Structures are given as C-alpha cells and as structure tokens.
A protein has these predicted regions:
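Bacterial N-terminal signal peptides
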Residues: 7-17
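Bacterial N-terminal signal peptides that target proteins for export
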Residues: 1-7
Length: 337
C-alpha cells in the first residue's frame, strides 16, 4: 500500500504580508528544534536495592530528569523524564499499564518502560524490559549514533541510515543507489535565497553545506540493537521479508521516515531531499513529519558553545507573533514513480 509523505506547511501573516523563513528545513531543525524527551517509567515493588540504584545511575545518562534528586536538569537539554511506580502503592491507571506490560514480556522487577512521542500527544514504546537487560539495550548511545551526530554537527544536511537486510543482492542495490543518487542530489539541490537576511539568520558556526551521506548498520550488529529493533517495529512486514531499510536523518537526530528498500527510488529521494533542503515554511516542529531518535548528545553546547543560540522555535499552542496564523495547509510529498 502506497505511503503518503505529508508535511504541514504553516503560513504566518501580518495583514496581507507573508513572513517567510528562508532557512533550509534541515538547518532550522538543527539550530532550533530540541529533540522530544522520552518518558521513562520504572516499575518496582518496595524500595529499590542499593545495587539497583547504582545500576540505574550508571546506565542512564545524567541528563535524565528525576534520576537524581541532587541535580537539576534544564528541560530543553533533558533526554527524558524518569518516574518511579511502586506496585505496592500504584493507582488504578498504573496497575492497568503494568498488567498490560507483564502479559506480553518478562515481568521481572524492576522493569523499565521507555516511551517516545510523535507530535505532542501520540506516544509509542521505544523499549521495555527488566532493569537487568538495560546495559545490553544501548538506549541512548551506540557507534552509529555517535558517528551520525558527528556528521550532522560537521555540516551534513542529511545522513541516510541503511539497515541491511538478509538479501545481499538487495543490500548492494541500495548501496549503489545511494552512492549514485546522493552526489547527484548534491549537484542538483540549490539552497533557498535570502539566507542571512532578517528572519532567516544562522546562529551556529556549523558550515551550511549541500552535503548528503549514508551510514550503514549491519542488521546483526548487537551494538545497534536498539535502533534496529525500533526501525523493524515500524516496518515489521518488510523486515520479515528480509528487506533493507533506509532512514533519512536530519537536524538533531530526527528521522523523517523508515523506508523499505523496495520503495526507495530516485524520484522519492529527490522529493524528500528537496523538502529537507527547501525553505522552512513550517516553524512548528510538531506539525512536521518525523520522530526523534534517542541520542546522548548535548546539541545545545555543541552548536552554541558561546551561548549565542537563536530564539526558541514555536510549538503548537503558541502564537505566531504579530497577526494571526492562517490555517495549516497540507503539502503532499509524493512517493515518486
């Protein structure tokens, strides 16, 4: 069944004038879109043992709200929020959530549930399992995510992740497609005019480049099991057929979509790259396609070491400044042929 590639494009008017932003989507996302923080719930029964508390603090990044009572984490730099549910005193909603989890997986306590979000309301599970399995999960850090972050901070506009499939011929076909199409797109794509003018300023010293690369992840790489399982859960049918998956990632580790290898073609790659490299006409993050990957990277400090960061991007519910926002308009980004 054909996928529909949709992006919401928002127009802000002052009287009859249109306030345009000429910054490319990938750069606007890099400078202004904070990654969505995940929600973490630790189910336990009675007080945690000392070794369990030590394990929790050892395996989770320090930028998790609720992990330590002695440290305050700035919300905009938080990777997530951790809450504790003691099943001996849990309320009805918490018990219902736990009962659903314990029916589908190991119910050994302590048990951690990690949930992400698409937009402001839609939650989906990122990982779940006993605390004893957390070390092998590599929730926030892996070699691929370290390299992907390095490339994005060095100026790559989009990093295309390639998760290999079971069929080596299909894997090689996707490699050849990426090897051919990405240099072609670098020559074809032109950035919007007016970058640097009032309303379209750049704030980071990261070079603004028309540069696209791909990063391969072996499906059997245990160090990348978190990413592989996440992408596979989004495309289970294609994964069961052994297909490779391709994921364009931009900004601060935002995945645009998980694309089966059988659907990747030059037209689709061009359409998606034009969207990500075009003027950011929708500054509201939640109204753009994609979802944020869990990455232990302090983007703010890396991008703005001197503290000269841009004003925060608007989110749903915030006004558009002077004047009124026109109704959002749907832009269909076709799959290609």
């Amino acid at each position: 069944m054909a996928n529909r590639w949709l992006a919401l494009v928002c127009f802000t008017t002052v009287g009859s004038a249109l306030l345009a932003c000429n910054i490319p989507v990938f750069r606007y996302a890099l400078e202004r879109w904070n990654p969505d923080a995940c929600e973490m719930i630790l189910f336990h029964s009675g007080p945690l043992q000392t070794d369990e508390e030590i394990q929790l603090r050892k395996l989770l990044p320090s930028r998790i709200q609720g992990l330590s009572h002695s440290e305050t984490v700035v919300a905009s730099q938080s990777l997530g929020a951790l809450s504790f549910v003691d099943l001996q005193t849990a309320n009805d909603d918490q018990k219902k959530l736990w009962n659903g989890l314990s029916k589908t997986s190991s119910s050994d306590l302590p048990y951690l549930l990690v949930r992400g979000s698409v937009g402001s309301t839609n939650q989906f599970p990122l990982w779940k399992g006993p605390l004893s399995e957390l070390e092998q999960a590599s929730l926030f850090r892996s070699p691929a995510r370290v390299e992907m972050s390095r490339r994005l901070l060095a100026g790559d506009a989009v990093v295309w992740l390639l998760v290999t499939g079971l069929d080596q011929e299909k894997n090689e076909a996707i490699r050849q497609r990426l090897d051919f199409e990405l240099p072609r797109l670098e020559k074809q794509i032109q950035l919007p005019e007016g970058i640097g003018l009032p309303g379209s300023e750049l704030f980071s010293e990261v070079p603004l480049l028309v540069q696209y690369s791909y990063l391969e992840i072996d499906r059997n790489d245990g160090k990348e099991s978190f990413l592989i399982d996440l992408f596979s859960s989004i495309r289970p049918l294609e994964v069961s057929k052994g297909e490779p998956l391709v994921i364009p990632v931009f900004g601060r580790g935002r995945a645009l979509e998980v694309i089966p290898g059988s659907e990747l073609n030059p037209h689709l790659m061009t359409d998606l790259t034009l969207f990500l490299s075009g003027a950011c006409s929708c500054q509201v993050k939640e109204q753009n396609p994609g979802f944020d990957l869990l990455i232990d990277c302090d983007w703010k400090d890396e991008l703005f070491p001197e503290g000269d960061e841009p004003p925060p991007a608007r989110s749903i519910g915030q006004g558009a400044g002077r004047g009124q926002s026109a109704a959002p308009q749907l832009l269909d980004i076709p799959r290609g042929r």
